[in-house]
Each structure stands twice: as structure tokens, then as C-alpha cells.
């Protein structure tokens, strides 16, 4: 029963992240929604590992690996965002046409 509740929570977090990713115009909100998606996937991975093979630690290790990759991605994205803000004085996604 608890597996179903956690899967519902995880799918709600994933859908909330996708909705925010599609509708948001602010780069910081987009990064937060992307992290929300990563955390929903991470929650699924850890809970499936716990319920199907509780003696294996590989799911928890993959979870830690995903957290480390997400932290590195967020740091790089925030550094790029800071550099773009210094040039454009805005963090709205529709105003970024530097790459064209």
C-alpha cells in the first residue's frame, strides 16, 4: 500500500515539474522544475530498489549519483544564467537570442 502512495507522490511531482517546465518563462523557475523532475525520478528509483530487492544497495548508490549530477548541473546552469543576466539584465527565456 505504501508503494502506491509513494508512486502517486512521485508522479505528481513529475507532472508538476513538467507543467512548470512548459509554462514558465523565468530561467530560475525552469531550473527548479528540472530539479523537481530529477527528484521524482530519484524517488522512484530508490523506492523500487527498496521494495523489490531490499538487500541491494545499488538503487541508493544510483540515487546518490543522480543527486551529485543534478547538483553539478544546477551549479553550471546558475553560472551560465548569471553571465547571461550580466549581459542582458533579464532572466526571461524569450529574451535570450544570443545563440542565434
Curated annotation (Swiss-Prot):
GO MF terms held by the record: oxidoreductase activity, acting on NAD(P)H, quinone or similar compound as acceptor; quinone binding
UniProt keyword terms in alphabetical order: Chloroplast, Membrane, NAD, NADP, Plastid, Plastoquinone, Quinone, Thylakoid, Translocase, Transmembrane, Transmembrane helix, Transport
GO BP term (any one): photosynthesis, light reaction
Swiss-Prot/TrEMBL catalytic activity: a plastoquinone + NADH + (n+1) H(+)(in) = a plastoquinol + NAD(+) + n H(+)(out); a plastoquinone + NADPH + (n+1) H(+)(in) = a plastoquinol + NADP(+) + n H(+)(out)
Transmembrane segments: 2-22, 28-48, 61-81
UniProt enzyme class: translocase
Cellular component GO terms, alphabetical: chloroplast thylakoid membrane; NADH dehydrogenase complex
EC number(s) from the headed UniProt entry: 7.1.1.-
Topology of the protein relative to the lipid bilayer: Multi-pass membrane protein
Gene3D superfamilies noted in UniProt: 1.10.287.3510
Location(s) in or outside the cell: Plastid, Chloroplast thylakoid membrane
Chief location of this protein within or outside the cell: plastid
Name of a matching Pfam family: Oxidored_q2
Function of the protein: NDH shuttles electrons from NAD(P)H:plastoquinone, via FMN and iron-sulfur (Fe-S) centers, to quinones in the photosynthetic chain and possibly in a chloroplast respiratory chain. The immediate electron acceptor for the enzyme in this species is believed to be plastoquinone. Couples the redox reaction to proton translocation, and thus conserves the redox energy in a proton gradient.
PANTHER family xref list: NADH-UBIQUINONE OXIDOREDUCTASE CHAIN 4L, NADH-UBIQUINONE OXIDOREDUCTASE SUBUNIT ND4L
Quaternary structure note: NDH is composed of at least 16 different subunits, 5 of which are encoded in the nucleus.
Family, as annotated: Belongs to the complex I subunit 4L family.
Protein name (database record): NAD(P)H-quinone oxidoreductase subunit 4L, chloroplastic
Name of the encoding gene: ndhE
Amino acid at each position: 500500500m505504501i508503494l502506491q502512495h509513494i508512486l502517486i507522490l512521485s508522479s505528481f511531482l513529475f507532472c508538476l515539474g513538467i507543467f512548470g517546465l512548459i509554462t514558465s518563462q523565468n530561467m530560475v523557475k525552469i531550473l527548479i522544475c528540472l530539479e523537481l523532475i530529477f527528484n521524482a525520478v530519484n524517488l522512484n528509483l530508490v523506492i523500487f530498489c527498496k521494495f523489490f530487492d531490499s538487500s541491494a544497495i545499488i538503487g541508493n548508490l544510483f540515487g546518490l549519483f543522480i543527486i551529485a549530477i543534478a547538483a553539478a548541473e544546477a551549479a553550471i546552469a546558475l553560472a551560465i544564467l548569471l553571465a547571461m543576466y550580466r549581459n542582458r539584465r533579464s532572466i526571461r527565456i524569450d529574451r535570450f537570442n544570443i545563440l542565434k
